[in-house]
Amino acid sequence: MHMPFIIDAHLDLSMNALEWNRDLRQPLKEINRREIGMTDKPDRGNATISFEELRKGNVGLVVATQIGRYVGPDNPLTGWHSPEQAWAQTQGQLAWYKAMEEEGQMAMIRDKKALEAHLALWKDGEPADKKPIGYVLSIEGADSFITVNHVEMAYAYGLRAVGPAHYGPGRYANGTDSTGHLNAMGKELLRTMDRLGMI
């Protein structure tokens, strides 16, 4: 039976790898076995994603996230105490994606040409078990952009999608369970994204 090509439009791969310490190159059974008895995070031992599982499901393209939340002094949520710390976290996540590219596990999709080449590879009739998972790099919440100029830096390294807000009060816009709107920095962020052709 022919499986359709599937795109996952939001996948926290680097967070799974770095915050949850999951080696996504391993089979799912092994990832979950290594978490037996762990209680530091909810759902330990219940991982659902690995590169092998993505390939089995013919999920050949994902919108892969970076995330680094900044929280102000009066914000009770968890997060970094400075945008610089949040930026550093996203750069560590980027380094993980690059390491997976070097291993042939992933392939960054920066433009239409790369997308078309990647789709052709996945539709060539060959088994998917050794094919790289394509990814469009996104960021979940813009809090880690120290300045709007950091959006341009991020675009240069391959970031193509930005969610200005994530959860709670944000530096550029307020997210889930908070009220408000795009502030002046948020509007400048959107203008920069528009100029760069980002989504």
Model-predicted regions and their roles:
Residues 189-199:
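Substrate-binding cleft of carbohydrate-active enzyme catalytic domains
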Residues 1-184, 188:
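N-terminal hydrophobic targeting/anchoring segments and the immediately downstream early-domain regions
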